[in-house]
Amino acid sequence: MNLPFFLAKRIYANNTDKTRVDRPAIRIAIAGVAVGLAVMLVSVSVVFGFKHTIRNKVVGFGSHIQVANFMTLQASEQYPIQMGDSMLKVLRAIPGVRHVQRFAIKQGILKTNSDFLGVAFKGIAADYDTTFIHQHLVAGAIPHFSDSVGKQQVVISQAIADQLNLKLGDKVFAYFIDNTGVKARRFSVAVIYQTNLSQYDKVTCFIDLYTAVKLNAWETDQASGAELTVNDFDRLDDTAARVVNKVNRTIDRYGETYSSQTIQEMNPQIFSWLDLLDLNVWIILGLMLSVAGVTMISGLLIIILERTAMIGILKAVGARNVTIRRTFLWFAVFTIGKGMLIGNLIGMGLIALQHYTGLVKLNPATYYVSTVPVEFNLLVWLLLNVATLLISVFVLIAPSYLVSKINPATSMRYE
């Protein structure tokens, strides 16, 4: 059997004397590792959950990549672009693209007897993936929107419903103003949704693509553009580059120029803010590893000083400094392991509690979510545990050299 491992195991197993000086030090070291690991697990889980939740909401409103008229992407006004079957086929054939859906935007005003509100009507058809709307459905059933028949039904947010005092099934007039005059439509509220992403909830309604195209006075094969969903968000830039090479700067049969833009380019403030969360995580990880390292160093030094006589006896019977150092490093591994076990139980328990109960609430007007989102990632969990163990042991190598300074004659005479 490995001698340092055997000695460390005996020392750790027999460390039950309540009068020993090193017992509080060991407990503090275990607590330091446990708290540090628990905080790291919870912090990473919250940041992952928060980033992915907000990102998915933004993507839900605009997909990963938009292909549209060059002028539309440069200004707030909507310009049409040909989006017929041939172009859709080209977009769907691009590697990395999972789904393609058409859309048309028309600015308008929703008006009730007591109030009115300017909104953006987003026309969608049968090819539109409504999973995002279903996930945030408050009331109603999503109509089967079409590009060939007008439904006269509208999907509105809870924020719009509250401001205009609308409920499911209510009739509401919409007015559209352009160079030809004012157009009016009467819609029935078919669905109410709520994402808590206020800048979208306050202005976004969904209608059928047919009505949106007609209100814009466009041709039947024209739209505001197409939204592309990619297979892997981490490879968004690669897929976007393929879209640029395939589509950008090409001209449709009406003389309009195609262009494209990623969701990150359309929402730079939100994604820059989410990127800052990564910096916060690294700061927290650094602080927690420092706390765990300092408590372990202090504990190891106290343990070595407390067992000076034992070190002297081991040296007297021929044990080398490296053997004794390894003994105390193995002892530290046992201590760190116990702390990590407790830390994992605490951290994973808190993550599970928040995931299943939503115990910690947030102000959705500020944070875009009503509860703190958490997300468990197995790979990150493994990396955090391995990194905590390796770093904690690594920082103890230098303090363990204190063993070589202990003189066996002096230590045994003292005993």
Q: Where are the regions that the model predicts?
A:
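Membrane-interface junction motifs in transport/secretion proteins
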Residues: K51-D85
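Short helix-loop junctions at transmembrane helix boundaries
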Residues: K338-L384, I397-Y401, K405
